């Protein structure tokens, strides 16, 4: 886009500007001392070619020009207000800057042959307008020269006529919309096609060259063409009006070109004409003749036909013929030439009303919108206009569709509750309790939750008095019915399948211990709090019956002496995955416990609930005396507690296996809690194994021997004891191992900087199973007797290897197994110190070989 940058420094166009060859900016020729009669071939501005320029003089010249133009504008405004007639007012020097020519208009040759731009006047006689000034709007189809660089406005020319009120809408001439052609231009396919045409001959003198003129068209809306072709005389039918010129191609070429959008419009674009005698197309959008301004409409009065002119059969020529009688000053209108399958043809006058579905209606609306963006019907009869009929049809169809939807919606709303039976909501259909209480909730979800809680409270009143803090202790005990518990039929108001149980008033205020809390072997709170598994369903014996109270002599105590269950329940809970339960099938082999036994667990449920259903997660068991494959889908029994002898610093206690309990002499002893359960209460420990790729039937272990003389260690592989295996296949229980256990050093050897320092973060950790406790017992009992290592009651003499015979090695990077061994030794050392601090006297004790930490077993 051109830009004026002058030394004056005004940026408006005075009608005579010149362009710099280097930076392509425009400057006022008067400001740079250039005369209209002496225009240079090449011009460079003061910045590209520095030279002295009088900027003050240039500023005064342009300022005087602007003052003259303002005076002229005031004179014109006074003349228009005093007289509405069209008058001509001439200025002294040039035209108004508003309507002055742009730098891209008109080409003339100066005195020295230089190309320059000059403002031109263009007028057209007729009844539509009086005078029109030179065009000021650029047009893509206007011819222009690539070498145009300078513009000039001759000062001696008469001033331009101003725009009058009658013609102020049309600011440029129709000549700027096209390039006049002397003859048609044919494409290769059109030229080949035209050789085989059989057309009539026409004499050139028969054509009415001056029968029409181009006039501006006043349109109510914007359209692509602002001009039309109007007859100046009476034209009879079948009369050649004028020749149509342009670029000639075939219809196949035109339709296949995507820019023509024929697949959407279904008709030629404006200034494009289809020949009625052949398959040729005349494209006059860029170049052509005055006939290109013939608009199209539904009531056409002309058609384009191809003929041979003056007996020449070389190439055809295209003539605009009149089809009807055309009166003077009547617009020449051509045919739309719609496609044969165009849907607009169904809306022509005399055709029956078409029917379209909603999808076709939307497509029709899109075609109409696109078509009207390029075209405008030139017919004055809008009632018979195809586009008006299509527009009305689309609007009526949409209104009918909207009215149909509204009527359907009204029909749905008209269905009142009185005419339609009301469907109660799920919450309303639920039976309410006979005695309304505060537990009845408003919402459906809260109602069922409160009903669920109420049924639990009525079935198991002892839940009210249980502790509320989390407990991680599993206590195994045999069921014992309370004498004060009576059965009651299910409550009909709540429609609960669970039996409601009331507590006797005599024992309601009595403080019961959890160790004395017994329940029926078939019904417990765990049945209510946990889902029923298939195994539990198979074990049920049908409806509940009144249980008989067993005699106290028949109940075998499972709680070790001096064990306070209530105190244990108040301690910190442990993860339920660290202590898997034992399958009842294992217990049935060696224990008289029946399947009626329940396990009091409070890990995920309320405290004191009797759970008949074990966790379904599968875990491998490490057994001392049993190699069978456990059944984890059945009930299991497990117990863990922490004796007071093993209190550690901080709030994180270590778990102690239930087989370690105190005798009457306050000494810890490793033995089953009862002789009758010695086979079932085996040492069942499990570590959380991250790597589950352990091979079955593979026995791996290593003995770690420590020398108390210098604290060095030797890691020698050895065969693991027979009773300690990862095998899951059922194997008969072998006798206890008799191989000597590894020697564990005393506290003095642990302190001699042979192991990592006692980091509280390492020592204050949570023991995962009974191996740590067994090693703790072994270490604590070897404090007073460091040379005695007890394995199954037999004393093993320490090695006589001297300190000099033992190999010494430089510090090296520890492996994962070595690091775990050292960390566990530090833990055991800290536990021994804690036991001594509490005044516990350790004594030799028999430790199974399976309790020795296996470095290959991953925590």
From Swiss-Prot:
Q: Where is the composition biased (Basic and acidic residues)?
A: 505-516, 626-653, 662-678, 688-700, 831-843
Signal peptide span: none
Q: Where is the composition biased (Low complexity)?
A: 117-131, 414-431
Subcellular location(s): the record lists:
Nucleus
Q: Which residues carry this modification: Phosphoserine?
A: 496, 533, 575, 714, 716
Q: Which Gene Ontology cellular-component terms appear in the entry?
A: heterochromatin; nucleus; Rpd3L-Expanded complex; Set3 complex
> Which ranges carry the SET domain?
210-337
Please note every region of biased composition (Polar residues): 95-111, 565-576, 701-719, 779-807
Q: What ranges does the record give for the region Disordered, renumbered to this chain?
A: 66-163, 408-436, 483-516, 533-592, 621-740, 779-859
The segments annotated as PHD-type zinc fingers are: 5-51
Principal subcellular localisation of the protein: nucleus
GO terms (BP aspect): meiotic cell cycle; negative regulation of DNA-templated transcription; negative regulation of gene expression, epigenetic; regulation of DNA-templated transcription
Q: Which domain of life is it from?
A: Eukaryota
What keyword terms does UniProt attach to this protein?
Activator, Chromatin regulator, Meiosis, Metal-binding, Nucleus, Phosphoprotein, Repressor, Transcription, Transcription regulation, Zinc, Zinc-finger
Q: Which SUPFAM superfamilies match?
A: FYVE/PHD zinc finger (SSF57903), SET domain (SSF82199)
Q: Name one GO molecular function term.
A: methylated histone binding
Task: Name the family.
Answer: Belongs to the class V-like SAM-binding methyltransferase superfamily. Histone-lysine methyltransferase family. SET3 subfamily.
Q: What task does this protein carry out?
A: Transcriptional regulator that acts via the formation of large multiprotein complexes that modify and/or remodel the chromatin. Required for both gene activation and repression. Part of the Set3C complex, which is required to repress early/middle sporulation genes during meiosis. Required for the transcriptional activation of genes with high activity.
Q: What is this protein called?
A: SET domain-containing protein 3
Organism of this sequence: Schizosaccharomyces pombe (strain 972 / ATCC 24843) (Fission yeast)
Q: What gene makes this protein?
A: set3
């Amino acid at each position: 886009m051109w830009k004026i940058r002058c030394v004056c420094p005004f940026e408006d166009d005075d009608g005579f500007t010149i362009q710099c060859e280097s930076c392509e900016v425009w400057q006022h020729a008067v400001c740079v001392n250039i005369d209209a009669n002496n225009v240079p071939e090449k011009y460079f501005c003061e910045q590209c070619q520095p030279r002295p320029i009088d900027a003050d003089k240039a500023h005064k010249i342009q300022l005087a020009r602007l003052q003259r133009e303002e005076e002229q504008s005031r004179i014109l405004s006074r003349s228009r207000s005093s007289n509405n007639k069209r008058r001509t007012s001439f200025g002294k020097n040039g035209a108004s800057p508003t309507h002055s020519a742009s730098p891209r208009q008109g080409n003339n040759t100066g005195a020295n042959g230089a190309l320059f731009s000059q403002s031109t006047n263009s007028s057209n006689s007729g009844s539509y307008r009086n005078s029109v000034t030179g065009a000021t709007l650029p047009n893509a189809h206007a011819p222009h020269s690539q070498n145009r660089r300078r513009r000039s406005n001759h000062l001696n020319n008469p001033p331009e006529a101003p725009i009058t009120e009658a013609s102020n809408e049309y600011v440029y001439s129709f000549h700027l919309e096209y390039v006049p052609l002397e003859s048609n231009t044919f494409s290769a396919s059109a030229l080949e096609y035209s050789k085989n045409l059989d057309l009539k001959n026409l004499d050139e003198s028969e054509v009415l060259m001056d029968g029409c003129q181009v006039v501006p068209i006043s349109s109510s809306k914007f359209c692509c063409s602002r001009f039309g072709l109007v007859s100046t005389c009476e034209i009879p039918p079948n009369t050649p009006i004028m020749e149509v010129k342009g670029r000639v191609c075939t219809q196949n070429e035109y339709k296949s070109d995507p820019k023509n959008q024929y697949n959407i419009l279904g008709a030629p674009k404006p200034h494009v004409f289809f020949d009625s005698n052949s398959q040729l197309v005349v494209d006059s959008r860029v170049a052509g003749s005055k006939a290109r301004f013939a608009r199209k409409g539904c009531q056409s009065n002309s058609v384009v036909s191809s003929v041979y002119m003056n007996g020449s059969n070389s190439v055809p020529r295209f003539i605009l013929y009149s089809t009807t009688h055309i009166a003077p000053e009547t617009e020449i209108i051509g045919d739309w030439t719609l496609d044969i399958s165009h849907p607009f043809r169904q809306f022509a006058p005399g055709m029956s009303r078409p029917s379209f579905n909603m999808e076709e209606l939307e497509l029709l609306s899109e075609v109409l919108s696109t078509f009207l963006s390029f075209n405008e019907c030139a017919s004055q009869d809008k009632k018979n206009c195809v586009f008006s009929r299509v527009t009305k049809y689309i609007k009526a169809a949409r209104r009918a569709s909207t009215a149909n939807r509204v009527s359907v919606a009204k029909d749905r709303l008209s269905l009142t509750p009185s005419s339609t039976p009301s469907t109660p909501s799920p919450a309303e259909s639920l039976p309410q309790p006979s005695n309304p209480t505060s537990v009845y909730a408003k919402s459906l979800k809260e109602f069922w939750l409160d009903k669920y809680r109420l049924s639990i409270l009525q079935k198991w009143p002892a839940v009210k008095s249980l502790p509320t803090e989390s407990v991680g202790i599993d206590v195994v005990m045999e069921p014992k019915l309370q004498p004060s518990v009576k059965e009651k039929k299910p409550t009909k108001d709540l429609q609960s399948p669970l039996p409601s149980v009331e507590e006797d008033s005599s024992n309601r205020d009595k403080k019961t211990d959890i160790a004395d809390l017994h329940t029926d072997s078939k019904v417990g709170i765990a049945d209510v709090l946990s889902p029923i598994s298939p195994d539990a369903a198979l074990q049920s014996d049908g409806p509940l019956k009144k249980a008989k109270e067993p005699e106290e002599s028949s109940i075998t105590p499972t709680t070790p002496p001096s064990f306070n269950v209530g105190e244990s329940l108040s301690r910190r809970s442990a993860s339920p995955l660290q202590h898997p339960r034992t399958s009842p099938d294992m217990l049935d082999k060696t224990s008289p416990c029946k399947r009626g036994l329940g396990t009091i667990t409070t890990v995920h449920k309320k405290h004191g609930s009797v759970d008949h259903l074990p966790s379904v997660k599968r875990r491998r068991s490490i057994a001392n005396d049993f190699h069978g494959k456990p059944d984890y889908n059945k009930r299991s029994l497990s117990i863990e507690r922490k004796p007071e002898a093993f209190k550690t610093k901080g709030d994180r206690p270590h778990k102690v296996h239930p087989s370690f309990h105190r005798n009457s002499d306050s000494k810890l002893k490793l033995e089953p809690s009862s002789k009758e359960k010695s086979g079932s209460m085996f040492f069942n420990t499990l570590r959380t194994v991250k790597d589950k790729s352990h091979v079955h039937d593979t026995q791996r272990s290593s003995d770690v021997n420590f020398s108390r003389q210098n604290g060095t260690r030797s890691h020698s592989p050895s065969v693991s004891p027979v009773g300690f295996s990862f095998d899951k296949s059922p194997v008969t229980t072998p006798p206890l191992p008799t191989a000597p256990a590894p020697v564990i050093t005393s506290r003095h050897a642990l302190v001699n900087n042979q192991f990592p320092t006692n980091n509280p973060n390492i020592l204050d950790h949570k023991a995962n199973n009974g191996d740590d406790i067994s090693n703790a017992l072994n270490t604590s009992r070897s404090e007073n007797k460091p040379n005695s290592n007890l394995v199954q009651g037999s004393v093993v003499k320490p090695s006589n290897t001297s300190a000099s015979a033992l190999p010494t090695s430089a510090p090296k990077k520890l492996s994962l197994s070595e690091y775990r061994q050292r960390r566990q030794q530090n833990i055991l050392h800290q536990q021994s110190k804690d036991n001594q601090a509490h005044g516990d006297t350790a004594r030799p004790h028999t430790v199974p070989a399976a309790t020795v930490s296996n470095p290959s077993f991953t925590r």
